[in-house]
Amino acid sequence: MRGDNFLYQEKFYYEDAERTFQEHLAGTYKPKPTAVTETLSGVLPSNTLKQLESAVALSNKVEALSSENKELKKCIDGLQGLLLGLRQRIETLEGKTTGAKLAAPPQKEEEDDDVDLFGSDEESEEAEKVKAERIAAYQAKKSHKPTVIAKSSILLDIKPWDDETDMGAMEREVRSIAMDGLIWGASKLVPVAFGVKKLQISCVVEDDKVSVDELVEKIEAFEDYVQSVDIAAFNKI
């Protein structure tokens, strides 16, 4: 009778152990290692308890591996999608490049069609004729362009021998000098010293036609009136 009471009192331990074992086999068991150990340590044999603990540990590992496997699958799916997108992008770019390369030859053929490898001499002569006409037109235009004449403005100081020199006669002699490109300008008498005056006269000369040295020599040739000739000012116009 005492033994029956013991079995009845301990019956729930066996039922709890059996339920835990069945849940483990079905994969629905959520282990509580501390509670299970405390509950079953006094009921099940040590070997059975060790086997149950091993099964629980294995179930935990399987569940962890399953979770890791799901995460890994998500990563793989993402990488596959990325690779697929890159592949499509590369194929699109390669298609455009290939299309451009294939489209280039016709343009080259059109250019080749414009080139006459067997052109006649008449075309060459025509080109030379056009070139010659253009050169002639340019030369004619250039020849009609007004040429800039370089000129200089000169101020001369002409000194007499003394105060008795006829300055009016000296000026007339100087102005009598005529040269192509020489134009006489204004003049005046400028006191020098001791009653002596010098003739200061201006003129404009074309540089290409009149030599200043030659002009001075012509003035100095009037020895009866002229002692010396100096260039007081010389300016390019």
Curated annotation (Swiss-Prot):
Q: Tell me the protein family, please.
A: Belongs to the EF-1-beta/EF-1-delta family.
Write out the function statement from the record: EF-1-beta and EF-1-delta stimulate the exchange of GDP bound to EF-1-alpha to GTP.
Q: What's the name of the protein?
A: Elongation factor 1-delta
Top-level taxon? Eukaryota
Record's keyword annotation contains Transport = no
Per the UniProt entry, what species is this protein from, by scientific name?
Answer: Artemia salina
Coiled-coil positions are none
- Short name of any one Pfam family annotated for the protein: EF-1_beta_acid
The record ties this protein, via InterPro entries, to: eEF-1beta-like_sf, EF-1_beta_acid_region_euk, EF1B_bsu/dsu, EF1B_bsu/dsu_GNE, Transl_elong_EF1B/ribsomal_bS6, Transl_elong_EF1B_B/D_CS
Presence of keyword Protein biosynthesis = yes
- Tell me, how does this one assemble? EF-1 is composed of 4 subunits: alpha, beta, delta, and gamma.
Record SUPFAM superfamilies: eEF-1beta-like (SSF54984)
- Which ranges are annotated Acidic residues under compositional bias? 109-120
Query: Keywords, A to Z?
Result: Elongation factor, Protein biosynthesis
GO CC annotation: cytosol; eukaryotic translation elongation factor 1 complex
Region labeled Disordered — which residues? Answer: 97-120
Q: Which PANTHER family match?
A: EF-HAND AND COILED-COIL DOMAIN-CONTAINING FAMILY MEMBER (PTHR11595), ELONGATION FACTOR 1-DELTA (PTHR11595:SF26)
A single GO molecular function term of this UniProt record: guanyl-nucleotide exchange factor activity
